[in-house]
Each structure stands twice: as C-alpha cells, then as structure tokens.
Amino acid sequence: MHELYQPREIEAAAQTFWDEQKSFEVSEQPGKDTFYCLSMFPYPSGKLHMGHVRNYTIGDVISRYQRMLGKNVLQPLGWDAFGMPAENAAIDNNVAPAKWTYENIAYMKNQLKSLGLAVDWSREVTTCKPDYYRWEQWLFTRLFEKGVIYRKNGTVNWDPVDQTVLANEQVIDGRGWRSGALIEKREIPMYYFKITAYADELLESLDELPGWPEQVKTMQRNWIGRSRGMEVQFPYDQASIGEAGALKVFTTRPDTLMGATYVAVAAEHPLATLAAQGNPGLQAFIDECKGGSVAEADVATQEKKGQPTSLFVEHPLTGEKLPVWVANYVLMHYGDGAVMAVPAHDERDFEFATHYGLPIKPVVRTSAGDQTPAPWQPAYGEHGELINSGEFTGLNFQAAFDAIEAALVKKSLGQSRTQFRLRDWGISRQRYWGCPIPIVHCDTCGDVPVPEDQLPVVLPEDVVPDGAGSPLARMPEFYECSCPKCGAPAKRETDTMDTFVESSWYYARYASPHYEGGLVEPNAANHWLPVDQYIGGIEHAILHLLYARFFHKLMRDEGLVTSNEPFKNLLTQGMVNAETYFRMETSGKKTWINPADVTLERDAKAKVISAKLTSDGLPVEIGGTEKMSKSKKNGIDPQTMIDQYGADTCRLFMMFASPPDMSLEWSDSGVEGSHRFLRRVWRLAQAHVAQGASTGLDIAALTDDQKTIRRSIHQAIRQASQDIGQNQKFNTAVAQVMTLMNVLEKAPQVTPQDRALLQEGLETVTLLLAPITPHISHELWTQLGHNEPVIDAGWPAFDANALVQDSLQLVIQVNGKLRGHIEMPASASREEVEAAARINENVLRFTDGLTIRKVIVVPGKLVNIVAS
C-alpha cells in the first residue's frame, strides 16, 4: 500500500476494475428486491457544471447504498439531446446540430465516468437518435387516432423577420430575442395533447405520492388549478348587439353576482370583434392587446388597460344593463374569454374600475366593513355575509352560492361547473432540431398518421439552420411524400415536437432500451417501474414532472405499464452557489469577474473584508453568494477540481457541505478540508496495514477502554444508517465518520486486541464511506484483506450489545449549575442514583446550610438538586 494518498492512480484503477467487470450492468432478477434510482438526464451542453456533479453524486450515493443493502439496483444515464441550444450553437458556429450534440455527448460522458458513477451505460439513451424517437412517433400516432392528440389553431408569438414562433421567454419587451423585430400574435395550426382529460386524476393521484416534497405537490395542484364555480350567462342587450344570445362567464364567486357592474372580454372575443367594426380606436387597442404576451404571469403583472364598447349585456337576475369593455387582463384561453367584473371584491376589477371611473358596489360584509374605499385591501376579497343583494342579503358564502345557483338554473342562465387552470399541451414547434411529427397532410384524406411500418420519420442530420424559419419547411426532399391512405401526392408535417415530450417517457425506455418490438418491453417495464427514487432540480416541479406523470397515465392506458405514477420518491436537490465579484462600469453596467482572478483580504475571523483583481491590484465589489452561472462568471469547472483533488474529494465535499435538498455554498477551503480528511483515512489505514494482518477480535476480552472505542464504531454505524437510509442527510452521515476517525486516530495500537479493534474500525469507515467516496473505499477494502470488492460487501449492521454501557457518567447540578460528575452502573435505579448524588462531596459543599427541596433525575444524563 503506497504511503501517500494518490487519488489519480486509485480512481483510475477502480474505474478500470468496474468497467472490466461490468459491475453496474444489471438484468431483471425475479425474486430479488429491485431499486431503480434515476437522476434527471442532462442536456449535452458541452461541459458538466457543478449542478450536474451534485445531482449525479446524490443519485450515485443512494444507488450504491441500496446495492449494499443487497438490492438489484438500476441506475441508468442518457441524453436529453434535442432542443434550441443546439440550433443556436449551429447558427453561431456554422455546424450541424447533430455533430455539435454528438461531440458534446462524447466529452460529457467521459466527464461523468471520471466521477465514478455506478451507472449501467449499456442502457444509455440519446433522444435525438431515430431508435429512440421512433417510439415517440409510434405513440403519437396511437394517441392521434384515439383523439388524445388533436390539431387546432393556437395563438403564438410570431417573429416576422426570422419567420418563426417564439416561446414567451424569447420575447423581450415585445421584440424577438434574436432579430429584435416587433412580435406579432398569430393563429397557426398546432398539435395538442389533451392533458385536461386527465386533470382530475393528475390532481387526485398526488395524494398517492407521500415520498414527494409537499412544496412540489402544492405547485402542481396550483398549476392544475381546479376551481368549483358557476357558469353564468348574461343575455345580450339586443338593441346594442343586434342579435339574441348570451355572454358566458365562469366565476368562483357567484355570491358576488349582485355586485357586478360591468363585463370585460378578451381582445380575441367575438363581441370585441363586433364592437370594433367602424371603431378604429377600439381596433387599434385590440391589435395592441394581441401583440402582448400570451403568458399568464405577464398578464397578471402588466398595467390593466381597457376600452369601452357601445355594447351592453343584461344582468341575469336584475335585468340591469351592464357595459361591455375590452380589457387586456382577460385571457381568451382561460374560461370563456370573458369575466363578470365585481370591483368591490376582486383586486384586478377594483384597479380597473378605479382607473376608468366605473361603479364599485360592495355586496359582502368583510372584516374591513361594508364599504370598500381605495386603496384595495386584501380583506375586500374575503367571504362573508351578503349585503346590498336583494333577496340574498344576509346569506353566507355557501348559502348564497346555492341560492344564486338555484335562481340562475330556474331561468336557464347558469349552472355549477368545475374548471381547471390547466390548458391542453401544445407541442408543435417550428424548429428543426426536434422529433418530427408523424403526420401527412393530404388534400383528400386530411391529416393522416404515418403507418407503423413507415416509422420512424427520420430527421435529416446534415442540416445547418440559419435561424430564419423552419429548415424542414424549405426542404422538399423531406416534406414531399405520398398519402399513406390514398397514395396521392401529399405533404409531410414540418413542425417538430416540444422537447418536453422526449423527457416525459425516457425513464420507461431505460427498462428495455434496445427492445425493437415496442416502446417498452412490458415485463422489463413492470419489473423496474415505477422509479423508486427520482432526483432533480425544483425548477422542474411543474412542467417536466407534470408531463411525465401525464405520459405515464397515457402509457398505462395503452397497456404498456401497470403502475399509475412514474416516480415513487422525489428528491429536489438544492442549487450550488458561489461568491460573485464585479466592477461597476461608468455606464452603470456590471462587469462580472471570475473568483479565481480575485485576491481576498480576510480579518482574524476569516471574514472577507476586501477584494482585488489579482492582475491589476485594484478593488472589485463583492456581489454576494449566487447560483453558479456563466453570466455571473462564478462557476467552478468540475474537471479542474477532479484533476486537482480527485473525484472522491469532490463527491465528499458535495455530500458534506449541505443536506441534499438545501443550497450548497462552494468553498475552496471546504474542498481542501475534504481532501485532508481522505488523506487522514489513507494514512491511518496505511500505517495499520504496514504492521501486517491482525488477529480476530475477542469481544468477551475487551477492556473498558476498548469497549468505549467499539461503542463509537457501532454508534457511527447506527447513526449513519439512519442518516443515509431514512433521512437522506448525507452530510450528517459524513460527520459521523469524521467523529469515528477522531476516536480511531487516538486509539492505542499496542496489543493484538487493539489492532483487531482498529481493523474493525477501519473496515467500518471504509464501508460507511463506500457510497460517497467509492474509489478510495475500493482500494482500502482490498488492502484491509478482503477478496470481494467493496461494492459487493454488505452495508454494516450495528451490534446492539456494543452500544450497551456497563457504567454511565452523569452530570450533577445544584440549582441548575454544574457541580461535578458521578460514575454509576448503567443498571442503577433512580433511588441509587439520587443517593449517590446526595453524598457527592461537591453536592455536600454547595448545599451546606441549605435544605434540599427536590432531586430531579434525568435517566442516563444528569441529576439536578434543588436546594434553598
């Protein structure tokens, strides 16, 4: 055993062993407990960042621990390889996205391997390869034929210069992020998944996920947004509208119906179109609204604007004429594109009515009273007793809901309804680097799904996009085809799928990645699924996790899987943060500086008091701790850390610095501390091994001091098992090992029993560290005399007898102040402890002249004598 810890050699040897032995390749083993551990697969952006390292290390620790429990563990990895960054890189570098993507995958795979992950690479999937997306297209055609996927016009952000659709986040101040062109709203045909058909189940089956963070479930509940309310019809005023009919609105507050003073419609609503005829001012306002963002969050925060129309509707219960306004805060795709406005009890309506001088009529008595003077108060939105509401005055919320519903139903002008905030999922993208949509457009037959024997529709990989529109729409060799039904000339769909589709089912494909008979091989899928532990960032709480849950239910209903949910347990790891430094330019712009280029001055307590740029010695501003990012230049290259310290040090620091679900603050000194600790472990083991093999431990012959050392060993096992296995608090498990190391380093090594005890201690340290620092553990286990690799060793079990103490040292207090200690047999009764405390010489001294009023015994810990 080499005298010095040499991580480069140790890690290379361990990784070579695992590769040659195919240590992490698994197959279905009926009758053996399985554990499927999965970290969200990466986008092949080019290089790993510290967020990746943390994510995959957490997954690896869990996987290796479960393997040591004797389970058949699957931990696969692959690549979420379609998407916009590849197109942008292709445009910038004049290279095909496929080439860029595959080169990045090769580089990042080597980086991941250098971390020593216990991954079954034989199951690697790459979503941009036809053998993967072929099955996505197959499922698409099945769902299209069932009506779960349909085509309709949708409103999108259209960039007239680039001739392409932009996501909401690509529209900056109303302009395209790349071209700078003013964005238009445009209606184009798009494909949609009917996720709303599963809204109830997606909501209710959240209750079947006790292993998910409550925060994530709450976010999904809010996103699905089920609300019970009423559909209310406001009859048209025929004199102004010119025809019979009714304006439909949905409200969750029918109790406030008597306080409605106007109605507001979205810019796209038919009444808005009607009112704009011959009204250029209104038409201009409608065009302005249509040019705004289609994102709900943006609508919520923008200034509330509106225009009156000459149209009126009638109040369904009073017949009063209410004016129709066009307002920018009403969304056409939510509800019916119209709202009944009750300014006294709704903040948006209040803001709007105050601005435009519209009536505000309070109809609910709230904790703020019967009036609603400006400014808006949250109390105005409370439920309460009705006032100013005619026959409904005096009713509470539920009674008013029921009575007003009955009155509306009687007049055929309303009914109760459950509504969802969730919208159907539009998946059409006018992009090149995505999965082709397997539909053929035929003038005679309409939209025809591509037959199974003609799948996959292969995306040509030699295309270099220029950023202007969809390249596929300019490639007759791609879109010209024959109709699968009638054989006539037809046109292939040139839109590609949203890349969230690929990541919605990849976890299932890992169960049988090479299966050519279907999307999954049913036996394998049902053997491994659902995933036992899923790990990823909280930023995926809604879209990805909701879409994956939806897809799992689609696959279940297609008979592909039998479970209802894809992921039993979810761990959302925290971010990796680091210090930021910048200089403020005269323009007011911040120029960010890499921490590696900064020299710090610290005070006696190691607090940073000033920072200078190393190259010029001039001051820089300290920006505080923020998430590692390219823009702030505070990222640390994992490869540099691995090259300098080794993967085990990086893994140990990541696990020790913070609980996995909390943010982790990067610290160079923390990394160095982790490295020093591994050197200590190596040094102690090397010194022990150098003395030759130790004899077996004779537990019955242990001295009291040796029993104390052995107790520390088994306390560490008990606590670390609880920390890793039950609480996923890897940081406290590492702390237990560090505490044990302190004991072992001080332990005598004189007798054979001493050396046998140290052997047990070092084996325990090795096993407890094995999931976290697998390379050094692999080498130590061999050096400690074991033939089988540490990955096949079982997780240690604590010896309950070792934890039993023959005697206990108890604290003695007089009136709450420490006055000494007494040694007592562990079996001593309360009375014996009290008697021993009373005759302790310190107690006698501090109670001299006082009367002992009470003796409080806390078993195993302390005795407090109350005297006065």
From Swiss-Prot:
> Which segment of this protein is annotated as the motif 'HIGH' region?
42-52
Which stretch carries the motif 'KMSKS' region? 627-631
Keyword check for Cell membrane, yes or no.
Answer: no
User: Which residues participate in ATP binding?
Assistant: K630
* Compartment list: Cytoplasm
Its keywords, alphabetically, are: Aminoacyl-tRNA synthetase, ATP-binding, Cytoplasm, Ligase, Nucleotide-binding, Protein biosynthesis
User: Single GO molecular-function term?
Assistant: aminoacyl-tRNA deacylase activity
What the entry lists under Pfam families is as follows:
Anticodon_1, tRNA-synt_1, tRNA-synt_1_2, tRNA-synt_1g
Superkingdom of source: Bacteria
Please report which protein family the annotation says this sequence is part of: Belongs to the class-I aminoacyl-tRNA synthetase family.
- Any idea what this protein is called? Leucine--tRNA ligase
**What organism is recorded for this protein?**
Pseudomonas savastanoi pv. phaseolicola (strain 1448A / Race 6) (Pseudomonas syringae pv. phaseolicola (strain 1448A / Race 6))
Q: Which gene encodes it?
A: leuS
